[in-house]
Each structure stands twice: as C-alpha cells, then as structure tokens.
Regions:
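Feature for soluble, non-membrane regions of globular proteins
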Residues: 10-207
Length: 207
C-alpha cells in the first residue's frame, strides 16, 4: 500500500509502504494479549519497521518492489526491516478474537499427517517456540514436498528465503509478550493458542 505525504519543503512523494490496518480492534485479543501490548507492538514496533523500510528504499529501485521481492533479494538492514514488516503483518492475521480450539479442514489434515495428532503438533510447536534462542519467530510452514513442518527463524528470519511457505507463526521477540507476561515466554505461548485463526491457516495452506 502506497501513501502520499508532504515533505518539509512541501514536495509530495509517495511512501513505498504503510502500516497495514489490524484485522481487529486493539482490545480484541484480551485477556490473552492486552491492548497495551498491541499499542506498543503494533503501533510502535511494527510502525518503526515500516518507517525504517521507507527510509531505506526512498529514491531507489526497491521503492517499486513488493515486500516479497525485497525480502528474497536483499540482506542487512533492508532485509531486516522488510522481513519484519511482512512477518508482523502475517502474525496479526494468524490471530483473532474468535480463534483457538482445534484446527479443521486442510490444517487438521496436514497436521495429523505430519505429526500424528494436533496434541503432538501443539507440544512440538510450543517447545520449539519456547526454546527458540533469543529473538525470532516459530513457524508452521508448507515445504516443497507439500507437507508441513515446524521452522524456527532468528531475528527477522522469514521462511520464504528457504523456499517454504508460511502458514502460521508466533512472534517470540520479547516485545511480543513482556508487557503481559514479563519474561515468561511459555505462559505467552500457552495463551497464544487461544487466539490462533485456523481459517487463516487454512487459507494459506490452500492458496
């Protein structure tokens, strides 16, 4: 999404990227994730990545590229900010106020085939997220064989750079949970399961 803004010299230019709207209200994920967390995580952290990315692409050929094109063709600060914009947008869509419960449809079939049962998958995914060292993301991805697997990435890492398609993610950077859970990442992970938007997961598997 492009956004036109005024510079200090009153010259109009088009920002390459803007912060996508949340798919729900700031308080919609309570009591599992507070509105205060979203105000900081979405309103400040995610916005900062968007601002940084616009600063890096302004006046370059990258300003006309998609996030996916930048992510798969760059490194360093450009990659980090582009990937974090994409990762966070994907993360918000993976949750919803009417989420949680067991998967259905394509997600249930893929998870049962790969892990034997949803309980096995939930246990393995939770352990991977809890032990993902430092800052990063834990993903359920669709691999090149068409099956699903768990993938951990560090910092701004994104599955598309390894040829996998993201279908579900949890953000395990501390800013995702520190307001609500302090340093208790496992407690955040357990609460997060109540928010998983399985309809969105199905759409990613089938798309």
């Amino acid at each position: 999404m492009r956004k036109r803004v005024q510079t200090p010299k009153n010259k109009e230019f088009t920002m390459a990227f803007s912060l996508p709207p949340l798919p729900y209200e700031m308080n919609a994920l309570e009591p599992h994730i507070s509105s205060e967390t979203l105000e900081f995580h979405y309103g400040k952290h995610h916005q900062t990545y968007v601002n940084n990315l616009n600063g890096l692409v302004e006046g370059t050929d990258n300003a006309s590229k998609s996030l996916e094109e930048i992510i798969t063709s760059s490194d360093g600060g450009l990659f980090n900010n582009a990937a974090q914009v994409w990762n966070h947008t994907f993360y918000w869509n993976c949750m919803g106020p009417n989420g949680g419960g067991n998967p259905t449809g394509s997600a249930a079939d893929a998870i049962n085939q790969a892990f034997g049962s949803f309980d096995n998958f939930k246990d393995q995914f939770s352990k991977s997220a809890a032990t993902n060292f430092g800052s990063g993301w834990t993903w359920l991805v669709k691999n090149s064989s068409g099956g699903v697997e768990i993938q951990n990435t560090s910092n701004a890492g994104c599955p598309m750079t390894s040829g996998n398609k993201a279908v579900l993610t949890i953000d395990v950077w501390e800013h995702a949970y520190y307001v609500d859970k302090r340093n208790a990442r496992p407690a955040y992970i357990e609460s997060w399961w109540n928010l998983v938007n399985w309809d969105y997961v199905n759409s990613q598997l089938e798309g």
